[in-house]
Regions:
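Conserved hydrophobic residues forming the short capping helix/wall of the S-adenosyl-L-methionine
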Residues: 14, 107, 158, 230, ...
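Conserved SAM/SAH cofactor-binding pocket of Class I
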Residues: 98-199
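Mobile active-site "lid"/loop adjacent to the S-adenosyl-L-methionine
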Residues: 181, 192-222
């Protein structure tokens, strides 16, 4: 079957389950054929073998069931990196790049040295940690995650992207970090979804690990814990920077202010929602 006909049928199948049906189909077929998507515009009349059609059909069926394209491909672009992904971690999303941007802005305003240390809590694929490490090659970045599989995955992503100034440890938040502190900046994209949120039964998140998505107290329990504990691991004048839910900024700002952080501020994502909040620890 010709590429153009195969893709046309795939668009029709995925159009009922995905808002990005055309892109999904092209990415999946490019993966099967080991070509770029531009190949389809250059060679639409090329024939696809029966074996490749069967593999493509299997991927389409899985996508029809809602399985995320990133899991089907096994990788996802984030910042300037190409990251391996797996069902043991969240899929890196564009909104989380805002967390990287804010952290870089903060670090640009500080006196960076070769001893500048950055901590990423709940690192998952290592997306945030590795993006910061890539942009700040003279810094030391440590990423931690509770899940051993995530720690191993983040390490592979460091190797894949030739990043040597980031290391990854297994830890439940700060538990294994006593000897690693202090840090000039602590960043985190923690679980922040309410366990009763209806969106957990919709879209890609149905296939992502719930432990990386949900938190008690309306999604704020892990954020509360991090805010309470972070000062013990921050350097003087250090910053704590979070990603959080679109409707949680006011609560996060209150937690930070009550704990004694200063320069508390929130930053919007691409959709105009307050998505990242930071505070500086100035107490001795």
């Amino acid at each position: 079957m010709r590429i153009e006909l195969l893709l046309k049928g795939a668009y029709e199948r995925l159009n009922f389950v995905s808002e990005t049906a055309q892109l999904d189909a092209q990415l999946l077929l490019a993966h099967v054929l080991d070509v770029s998507t531009s190949y389809f515009y250059t060679w639409p009349e090329k024939q696809v073998s029966d074996d490749n059609i069967r593999v493509f059909d299997d991927l389409l069926s899985r996508r029809e069931q809602g399985e995320p394209v990133a899991y089907l491909l096994g990788h996802q672009a984030f910042w300037s990196l190409e990251l391996e992904v797996s069902p043991c971690t969240l899929i890196p999303r564009a909104d989380t790049e805002r967390l990287v941007e804010v952290a870089l802005q903060v670090l640009e305003q500080t006196d960076q040295t070769p001893t500048t240390r950055i901590l990423d809590l709940g690192t998952g694929t290592g997306a945030v940690a590795l993006s910061l490490a890539a942009e700040l090659p003279h810094s030391t970045v440590i990423g931690v995650d509770l899940i051993d599989g995530a720690v191993e995955l983040a390490g592979r992503n460091a190797t894949r992207n030739r990043i040597r100034n980031a290391t990854f440890l297994q830890s439940s938040w700060f538990d294994a970090l006593q000897e690693q502190a202090p840090f000039e900046v602590i960043v985190s994209n923690p679980p922040y979804i309410d366990p009763d949120d209806k969106h957990l039964s919709q879209g890609d998140v149905r296939f992502e690990p719930k432990s990386a998505l949900i938190a008690d107290n309306h999604g704020l329990a892990d954020i509360e814990h991090i805010v309470a504990t972070a000062p013990d691991f921050l350097a003087p004048q250090g910053y704590l920077i979070f990603e959080h839910g679109y409707d949680q900024a006011a609560a996060v700002r209150e937690y930070l202010t009550t704990r004694g952080f200063t320069k508390v501020a929130s930053f919007q994502d691409l959709g105009g929602n307050d998505r990242v909040t930071m505070g500086q620890w100035t107490q001795v």
